[in-house]
């Protein structure tokens, strides 16, 4: 099944890719879309392939007239895997919140332009960052 009859997956992928470097096409499966942001490098002195990053990831799933999302904050480790972790440094937390809110705003605006809404998933009750008013 494509995302919606009015919005085929290929067109959505192009629109999502236009939002910036966040879309991870290789991790998008079926009707699920995966985005992430490596916002803060843990240690810039390490070789690039060994660096870890604080950041966030968000997954979208289509419904009839909207997309639902879940997101996490955490560590992107040197193995290339995300691990949900509590962010202890307030400056890092602020940077993650700022980049996540900015992406969420642009994503919601893009979806509105194609007459879709963006809503938290029903089972996503523990949101670490308030994304909208």
From Swiss-Prot:
Keywords, comma-separated and alphabetical: Activator, Cytoplasm, Transcription, Transcription regulation
Protein name according to UniProt: Sigma factor-binding protein Crl
Transmembrane domains' residue ranges: none
Gene Ontology cellular component annotations, sorted alphabetically: cytoplasm
Cellular localization per UniProt: Cytoplasm
UniProt region (Essential for activity), positions on chain: 99-122
Entry's family note: Belongs to the Crl family.
Main location: cytoplasm
Function of the molecule: Binds to the sigma-S subunit of RNA polymerase, activating expression of sigma-S-regulated genes. Stimulates RNA polymerase holoenzyme formation and may bind to several other sigma factors, such as sigma-70 and sigma-32.
GO term, biological process aspect, one: positive regulation of DNA-templated transcription
């Amino acid at each position: 099944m494509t995302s919606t009859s009015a919005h085929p997956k290929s067109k959505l992928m192009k629109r999502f890719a236009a939002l910036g470097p966040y879309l991870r096409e290789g991790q998008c499966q079926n009707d699920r879309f995966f985005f992430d942001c490596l916002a803060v490098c843990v240690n810039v002195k390490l070789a690039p392939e060994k660096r870890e990053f604080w950041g966030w990831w968000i997954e979208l799933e289509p419904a009839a007239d909207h997309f639902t999302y879940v997101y996490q904050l955490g560590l992107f480790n040197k193995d290339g895997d995300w691990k949900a972790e509590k962010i202890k440094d307030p400056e890092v937390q602020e940077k993650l919140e700022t980049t996540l809110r900015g992406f969420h705003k642009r994503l919601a605006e893009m979806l509105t332009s194609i007459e879709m809404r963006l809503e938290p998933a029903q089972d996503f009750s523990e949101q670490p960052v308030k994304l909208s008013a």
